[in-house]
Amino acid sequence: MTTTKKTALVTGATDGIGIPTAIELARRGFHVILHGRRDERLAKAESLVRAAVPEASIEHARADLSSLAEVRAMGRALADRHDAIHALVLNAGVFAKGHDKSGDGFELTIAVNHLAHFALTSALIDRVRVAASRDGHGRVVTVSSVAHRSGAIDLEGLRAGGRHTDYEAYAESKLLNVVFAAELARRERAANTGVTSNSLHPGVLATKLLKTGFGRGGAPVEEGATTSVFLATDASVATTSGAYFVASRVAPHHPSADDAKLGAEVWSITEALASR
């Protein structure tokens, strides 16, 4: 597929902050690929985007992020349809209660929040590189959480597919997001591709995830899209990479994100798991 518009993919675009993220990207003239698990939810999300931006250019991409086979298939299909992807917004996330497992046998929270996004990025990074080299705009934006600061990476547990309580798994998954984003930034910088990779905390928001995981609400979800859209579009961060943002500003992240050795280990383990 060729388009004169820049193209953005938003995972988890049918719920929470995914919908306002898609709306704001469409408002800025992007062709927006909405990801979701079910066709009816994607249709509803598209109707919400079109209600806000009638001229929006929209496409659907369906996959259950708990299934690596579905993630890889979606990645291949999108890579076949698009020669360039200018913004890859890794937004989807879950807070699974108990010790739920994915169909692949991984801890569900780790599978969706970390492994799926690694696999999807691996499938599409060449298209982001094309956007960076051809159009000067190739960005990977990873939605983490302030919860990452209370996380700890258990490499042996990660090799085993996760072995934590529900909150520990969530906090670790959000720390893995930040470590992944920083390691991707190092790799793309070393290869001089022009691709940037940053992570962010969207805020404490009234999402289904917050209610499920923490039993409370928060600020309107529309506010949570602000930093994601900023990192995906703003000229002021065109060359910023490897940083963590809160409220559209660089903020301190967990020291693990600066540990290149740990980043390489996490990458290697995740690559092996995601290729099963």
Model-derived segments and their meaning:
Residues 2-36:
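Canonical Rossmann dinucleotide-binding motif of NAD(H)/NADP(H)-dependent dehydrogenases/reductases
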Residues 11, 83-93, 141-145, 198:
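Rossmann-fold scaffold of SDR-type NAD(P)-dependent oxidoreductases
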Residues 39, 61-76:
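The beta1-alpha1 cofactor-binding region of Rossmann-like NAD(H)/NADP(H)-dependent oxidoreductases
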Residues 53-57, 77-90, 96-101:
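A glycine-rich helix->loop->beta "capping" turn
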Residues 93-101, 106-110, 129-191, 201-216:
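Catalytic loop of short-chain dehydrogenase/reductase
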Residues 121-122, 182:
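A short, exposed helix-loop element centered on a Lys and neighboring polar residues
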Residues 173, 199, 216-254, 258-268, ...:
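C-terminal helical subdomain
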